Amino acid sequence: MNEITHRTKTRPVKVGNLTIGGNNELIIQSMTTTKTHDVEATVAEIKRLEEAGCQIVRVAVPDERAANAIADIKKQINIPLVADIHFDYRLALKAIEGGIDKVRINPGNIGRRHKVEAVVNAAKERGIPIRIGVNAGSLERHILEKYGYPTADGMVESALHHIKILEDLDFHDIIVSMKASDVNLAIEAYEKAARAFDYPLHLGITESGTLFAGTVKSAAGLGAILSKGIGNTLRISLSADPVEEVKVARELLKSFGLASNAATLISCPTCGRIEIDLISIANEVEEYISTLKVPIKVAVLGCAVNGPGEAREADIGIAGARGEGLLFRKGKVVRKVPEETMVEELKKEIDVIAAEMAENQEKEKQEQ
């Protein structure tokens, strides 16, 4: 990982079998869209998210039925589970009792001190962290009265207020988010938060929109934040299938060199020289490599003259021409293949290289 694009001196916090912060890799999160009390549907969606590359998943816990479902859900999934709690501290206690890995609350809206203390004590006993979720759209009244409207300073003040509540109870396994739907506000809030405290930061642009618009908005905002070395976990919030959130998050992290085990596709824009159906081929290959957990780079290019040289960093690739294609590795042509079989030949080569990479990774783990 490139240290230039990684926030250092961040307090490490355990979430299930993962460690957030410190010098650990940035983690991708998402949230289910199912009713949490529907265990079968929720587990099915979580498994889809996990297959797509989600590393932590959050579920809404609006009532007792949802809280009671936590234990059954936990038994059937492999990634850490987070409970999203508002107002009722008893739901947090039930979720903790059910084996939840992290609780997302705002201590200030849980109620009197004894209620917050009950949640903190239960979390402390189980070694469960608490995420303080600051949102520009739901800042406390006294902060809005002080600043007049949601500001980055107001959001940081809110975060510090909630942090102090937990610290006064000798609780320090804290993660903080500073979400806003306004991109510039979110960027400023995260920058100021990173200077104000050393707890891990969960990144997000809230209510960013539909698949297309939300992807652009999230990439603009979160990309600016990531470029400053800020962020320890991340969720892309979209009005879409949550699997799409994970796909966008993976691509965003790959763009900054922050996803060590993810396949990357290199493909050229179309032009008048192209003799193959580049767009459909690129989409097919992208889908094929989307679940690979190795850092393979694959190229799909339309020009057999310049293609291999332009994608010399690719582990494997094809460059199309009329009726045939060039299969190349690291910029050097391996062989010519007929157009009708070049995608299948590329997939075979991808499988071989991916298997080699996975084997090497396993050997490195055993040697450590």
Curated annotation (Swiss-Prot):
InterPro entries from the UniProt entry: Dihydropteroate_synth-like_sf, IspG_bac, IspG_bac-typ, NO2/SO3_Rdtase_4Fe4S_sf
Signal sequence residues: none
Gene3D superfamilies: Dihydropteroate synthase-like, Sulfite Reductase Hemoprotein, domain 1
Catalytic activity annotation: (2E)-4-hydroxy-3-methylbut-2-enyl diphosphate + oxidized [flavodoxin] + H2O + 2 H(+) = 2-C-methyl-D-erythritol 2,4-cyclic diphosphate + reduced [flavodoxin]
CC cofactor note: Binds 1 [4Fe-4S] cluster.
Keyword Oxidoreductase attributed: yes
Cofactors that this protein relies on: [4Fe-4S] cluster
Residues involved in [4Fe-4S] cluster binding: C268, C271, C303, E310
EC number: 1.17.7.3
Keyword annotations from UniProtKB, A to Z: 4Fe-4S, Iron, Iron-sulfur, Isoprene biosynthesis, Metal-binding, Oxidoreductase
Pathway in which the depicted protein is active: Isoprenoid biosynthesis; isopentenyl diphosphate biosynthesis via DXP pathway; isopentenyl diphosphate from 1-deoxy-D-xylulose 5-phosphate: step 5/6
Similarity section: Belongs to the IspG family.
PANTHER family for this protein: 4-HYDROXY-3-METHYLBUT-2-EN-1-YL DIPHOSPHATE SYNTHASE, 4-HYDROXY-3-METHYLBUT-2-EN-1-YL DIPHOSPHATE SYNTHASE (FERREDOXIN), CHLOROPLASTIC
Record's function text: Converts 2C-methyl-D-erythritol 2,4-cyclodiphosphate (ME-2,4cPP) into 1-hydroxy-2-methyl-2-(E)-butenyl 4-diphosphate.
Protein name, per record: 4-hydroxy-3-methylbut-2-en-1-yl diphosphate synthase (flavodoxin)
Native source organism of the sequence: Bacillus cytotoxicus (strain DSM 22905 / CIP 110041 / 391-98 / NVH 391-98)
Organism taxonomic ancestry: Bacteria, Bacillati, Bacillota, Bacilli, Bacillales
Encoding gene (name): ispG
